[in-house]
């Protein structure tokens, strides 16, 4: 959600697709934001959103065909009219999850800062904590990137984002970091620090807010704290690290929109009210 809002604020036309039709966390986040806009009257950027429904049938091929048709319909509706499509995939393996990975220009894999989450990427030696092998998810991504190269010669920029980072140094934090860096060299992804463990991120969800929104008493229901400001800086650093291809046309749209909003917020001068 933070990536989508960052792109919207940069003047990009953004669509979002939720492939996790069981949990629907992404869809609920967008819907919460939409409802808060309607209830509060605030001007918050909203993406064009789609949620691909689960397929039903007796055979796996029937289910996959239904889901592919729904996904293809969503892509066809937005690919010519939007600059970015942000897709949320389920944690479980599925046909659409693999397809989305193989289509991605930028793949962001969030990883909680623990060896429990690290296990989906690689295996480690119990004594030395050195990486000894590649796990199932990393294998799947490697195959998806290979398929992408075969189709159009494109190279997926794979970024592993370490989330829920402790603000304090610890042996676990150091060892996980060393493991991620080791795998980055082996698998060809970029490792970047993401979000620290902050309560404010969980507080944003009910209203669909992000750390990049203009946070005040109207949006939050209270004054922003130092933690809110720190979270905003943290998100901006992450967005910069992603190196998303934001074009100049989008930047001009964002500047024009900001100028219009600033002008709309100012009271009219006397000479604007009276005709010559």
Regions inferred by a protein language model and the residue ranges of each:
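Short, hinge-like loop/turn segments at secondary-structure boundaries
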Residues: 32-36, 126-128, 210-212
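P-loop/Walker-type NTP enzyme "switch/lid" segment
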Residues: 5-85, 91, 216-217
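Phosphate/oxyanion-binding active-site loops and adjacent basic polyanion-contact surfaces
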Residues: 67, 117-121, 231-235
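Conserved catalytic-core segment of NTP-binding enzymes
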Residues: 10, 90-193
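Active-site signature of alpha/beta-hydrolase-fold catalytic machinery across serine-
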Residues: 2, 6, 99
């Amino acid at each position: 959600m933070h990536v989508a809002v960052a792109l919207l604020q940069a003047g990009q036309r953004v669509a979002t697709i939720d492939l996790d039709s069981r949990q629907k966390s992404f869809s609920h986040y967008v819907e919460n934001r939409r409802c808060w806009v309607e209830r509060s009257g605030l001007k918050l950027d909203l993406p064009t959103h789609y949620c691909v429904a689960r397929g039903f049938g007796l055979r796996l091929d029937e289910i996959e065909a239904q889901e592919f048709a729904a996904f293809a319909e969503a892509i066809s509706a937005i690919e010519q009219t939007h600059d970015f499509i942000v897709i949320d995939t389920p944690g479980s393996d599925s046909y659409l999850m693999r397809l989305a990975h193989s289509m991605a220009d930028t793949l962001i894999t969030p990883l909680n800062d623990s060896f429990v989450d690290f296990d989906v990427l690689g295996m480690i030696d119990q004594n030395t904590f050195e990486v000894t092998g590649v796990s199932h998810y990393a294998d799947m991504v490697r195959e998806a990137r290979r398929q992408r190269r075969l189709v159009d010669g494109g190279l997926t920029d794979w970024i592993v984002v370490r989330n829920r980072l402790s603000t304090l140094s610890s042996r676990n934090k150091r060892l996980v970091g060393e493991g991620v860096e080791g795998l980055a060299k082996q698998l060809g992804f970029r490792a970047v620090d993401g979000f620290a463990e902050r309560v404010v991120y969980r507080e944003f969800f009910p209203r669909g807010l992000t750390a990049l929104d203009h946070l005040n008493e109207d949006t939050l229901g209270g004054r922003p704290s130092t933690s809110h400001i720190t979270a905003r800086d943290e998100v901006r650093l992450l967005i910069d690290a992603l190196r998303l291809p934001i074009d100049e046309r989008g930047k001009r749209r964002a500047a024009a929109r900001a100028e219009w909003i600033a002008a709309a917020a100012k009271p009219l001068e006397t000479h604007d009210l009276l005709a010559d």
